[in-house]
Amino acid sequence: MSVLHLSIRNESDISEAVRQSRAMAGRLGFSTTSAYYIATAASELAANLWIHAGGGMITLQRHGARGMELMTVDNGPGIADIDKALEEGFSTANGLGCGLPGVKRLMDELDIASYPGVRTEIKARKWL
Amino acid sequence: MKVPIIRLGKVLLVSIQVDLTDAAALQFQEDLINRISETEALGVAIDITSLDVVDSYMARVINDTASMARLLGAEVVISGVQPFVALALVEMGRELINVDCVFNLEQALKKLEVSIAARGDRGGNRDTYEW
Ligand SMILES: Nc1ncnc2c1ncn2[C@@H]1O[C@H](COP(=O)(O)OP(=O)(O)O)[C@@H](O)[C@H]1O
Ligand SMILES: [Mg+2]
């Protein structure tokens, strides 16, 4: 299976996203290290859905011939200043603020689009 | 899910087996603080061998727990950080885990023994405790 939609409604859904993303990365041929990077990134993104957006959806999928994408979509309050959100240590929820900067380093590409109050979409990709 | 806390002489052993929810993390921290003051423990070994993926949230729970234990005068060592967990944490940046780490529980106990002995101060007064 190369597309998986997981709804993040409570804390235990986060671990499911972690498990599934690591398994999919393995099936797609990523090294164990890369699969751990992807799973850690999935954990950060799914946790953000739960903490900052009151839930949302994470989609795990193959991207092109040699990649994997983690995509989150939510209808929470959104991210007013994306550059700030990507800064090391910036958090509006008294967190460590290293989730998004961490995802950026763990993955090869990170795109964030946010229409505050309407929809936030985050895509993180990694290539084989 | 409760995190069991085992006493071994002047040291407490904790093994975190699964990702903790917010509520479970708070409960664990409270339990550990109570046990430290009850037993006047001088050291705490936190084993995370069973944790498969450690994100910044779990890293923070571990760090905060270690700081609390230190405030109560206990030395803290983390053991069992899995190699791939370590790689991912380093890649994420910052010193996400800010506590001394060793490979396994045995080394954790050795390290605690050494640092407790090095303090001399309180360890010496607690001659009722045995390993
Ligand atoms: N899905 C989201 N919806 C709204 N805001 C978000 C979302 N994801 C991240 N953010 C914002 O970006 C900030 C930085 O996120 P992150 O680096 O993961 O740090 P932390 O989660 O520790 O606050 C958050 O504090 C929050 O303001
Ligand atoms: Mg976060």
Map each language-model feature to its residues.
Chain A
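Conserved beta-strand-loop-beta-strand hairpin that lines the nucleotide-binding pocket
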Residues: 1-4, 46-128
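Bergerat-fold GHKL ATPase/HATPase_c domain
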Residues: 1-40
